[in-house]
């Protein structure tokens, strides 16, 4: 009897619970029925749209089949009739994998518009210099091609560091593929002058120093560089356009990471770090004509990891001259300074164990069978000369819109008289320059003027003037261009002075004689840079 009472009590208590559960189930069933009705309505609408689309497509196909073929010639359009171009704008999206690129071994990326691939972005990116696309210079001076030829490896290493720092700043992964930068220039020029040894005015129009540069940043530590230059010098025989050829101007590999170490290594064909040769003129300074040396060295260098601070390098290469040991070496030291963002500059000096490999020593530009043509001349020279030591001291300072450049370079021992002579004695050639410049705005365009004084000593055999006064006006009328006009006044060595240089075995060159005269030259140049 007790059990019956307990069972009846439980039944009475559980009946409300079952009633609540039944009510919840009924509500859930009604909600699902409403959702099913909505989905069925959407399905009916889509089926109707599909049927309309098929009907419209069949109608267009029937009209196209019934339309006669159009003649191949275009119909004549009445004058003034407007032709409406059909186009539309679409949103472009970048489609990239969610997985890290290293997991799939490449970087597949696509630009998508209207569910179609517009273009794929993959492989090695090729950009115009500078790498970052930062273009502060209207005149194109920030391009690779306009970086100084001396220590270009160091400046490219600094640019490479800025590139990879930019990747880190915006949170991009460091790419494991090369980044190739293209740069170049074309500088057509016209000159008018009255030379030392002629009473007639001479003129010329030439393409000038045109060049194409390729810099490939393989990673944070390694970069390769190649510069192909146009050879404007006339051939020994025939018209000068026959020598319109490109050759390797520079090419090297640089290994270094200034964020990790101030040490670096460079090997290839470069201008050795001896001298600075900075100038705003159209003409090359006499210091460059005398001592700039392009060869194939190995360079071990140090560069302060900050923008300012000390730098240095030691280098060695095989000499083109054949007398004595073939090895030549040198050292370069300097310091870059800056104060309050207004004053900046550089001071430095260098030593080289032989100046005989310099461009101005290897070729003087003399005609075949006349005066000394340089140690590298087949008809007017000889490489069997003694190696002669040289030194360089230079300084550059800029303040606000003004800049001053000073440099001296020269042999610190005399050549043998049979190698290079001046007034019958062994020559000790030297050169110096002083140049003052100022930048300003002209006709709402960036412009600059510069004046300079240059001199040489015992360099008559190298066809260099004794003194030079020079001035230039530069302006960038259009972006990435520099239009220049230069006036140059050269003074030759005296009438009583004479010089000569090494000749082929069994021959003697004609002596180079001073004229005591002056020469005036006007040059106009348009430089285009990219």
Curated annotation (Swiss-Prot):
Signal peptide: 1-19
Stretches the record annotates as Disordered: 50-81
Domain of life: Bacteria
Coiled-coil annotated residue ranges, if any: 20-66
Keywords: Coiled coil, Signal
Bias-annotated ranges (Low complexity): 63-75
Similarity annotation: Belongs to the UPF0422 family.
Protein name listed in UniProt: UPF0422 protein lpg2959
Species this protein is from: Legionella pneumophila subsp. pneumophila (strain Philadelphia 1 / ATCC 33152 / DSM 7513)
